[in-house]
Amino acid sequence: MSNQTERKIEMWRMTIALVLAAAAFVIAGCGGGSGNTDVAPPPEDADAPATGTLKFFAYGDTIVDPMLDPFRKQNPDLELKTASFDSNKAAAAKLAGGFEADVVEVCTDEMSPLTARGLLRPLDGKAVPAFHDLAFSGAPEVRDADGNVLFVPASAGPQGLIVNSDQLDPDTITSYADLFDPAYVGEVALEATPLTAIGAGALAMGLDDPMNLSDEEVEQVKEYLLDHRDQFRAFAESDASMVNLFKSGEVQLADGGRGTTQTMIEDGVPVQWIAPKEGSLSWVCGLAITSKAQNIDAAYKLINYYASPQAQAISGDMGFVAMNPKALPLVSPAFRKTADPRNLKNAIPETEPENADAYDRAWQEVQAG
């Protein structure tokens, strides 16, 4: 699986700089709001190949050739231009500053800079026939206040528990609370991102809505993490770091995704992924049409492709969950277990809290000790 952990870390590190950049754009009169935020009209002929130029702005692991080559073959007269970003905050700053894109990738834990500036154009859900087949299509974050579809879910990754099955009995690991069991002191790692770390701590404490904690609850989780700080061998700042901690034998238990677990297995590490009884935290990303999109027909064509069983099978072979269950038979047998959308059952979408700054400050204090 590609490095989703690094995505989130980069997002939080860039917050202050990008807020200042946003202010500069507003002062300069370059802010959002001049685009069209009406529902994007569907193509007159949805089956016709796309033509013209389509500009696609997304995370780097979304715009890889194995995923895009079939779309290019289906639309030979379309010029597809791609560009990547490191966070939705960075994407919003560029789009508000005049960067042109027709389709942009959005993630539920960081999309507010795009929505607050009016940089997204709602979609006609009927123009995406597979929409209701997709995992998380019914999540409230997918729609705006008027009930219009803002983006089409295209990828997700459940965060559960990773256990070294040679050292620990996987049947005894069932809860986020196990990360804090003193029996495993010094052999546990925690992903070093505010939402995931605070979320895992909250669930371990019995708080069942980890993305909507009050400031007081965030403070309680912070104190809980500080009280158990010696429990953790490391706070892993990337998927690669987490893999290395298990390979070296330093860590026997951690929170993490199925893709990271699969990477370890391929490297010969005896690990097993476990869905916690509280529910797995999960990042969720998808594709949206920008408010200044020029090629609406091609934008719908691309979004429908990403929602298709064919594209989702490719995504499954890349280590992601296949958001369309009809893709599962097309996924390579080696990846079918990790790609199964049933992995997202009872998942808790990571969304951007209204008091995200409180999560950030709390986690910084935990890391500082």
Regions found by a protein language model. Give the residues of each.
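Extracytoplasmic ligand-binding site segments that recognize negatively charged/polar headgroups
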Residues: A58-D65, E100-A101, E105-K247
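A ligand-binding cleft/hinge motif common to bilobed small-molecule-binding domains
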Residues: E110-T115, K247, Q252-P270, G319
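C-terminal motif of bacterial Sec signal peptides marking the signal peptidase cleavage site
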Residues: V26-G29
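Early extracytoplasmic/lumenal segment of secretory-pathway proteins
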Residues: P41-P113, V243
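Extracellular/periplasmic bilobal clamshell ligand-binding domains
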Residues: S332-G369
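Periplasmic-binding protein-like
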Residues: E219-H228, I265-S291
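Bacterial signal peptide processing site
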Residues: G31-S34
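Mature extracytoplasmic/periplasmic domains
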Residues: L281, C285, T290-A347
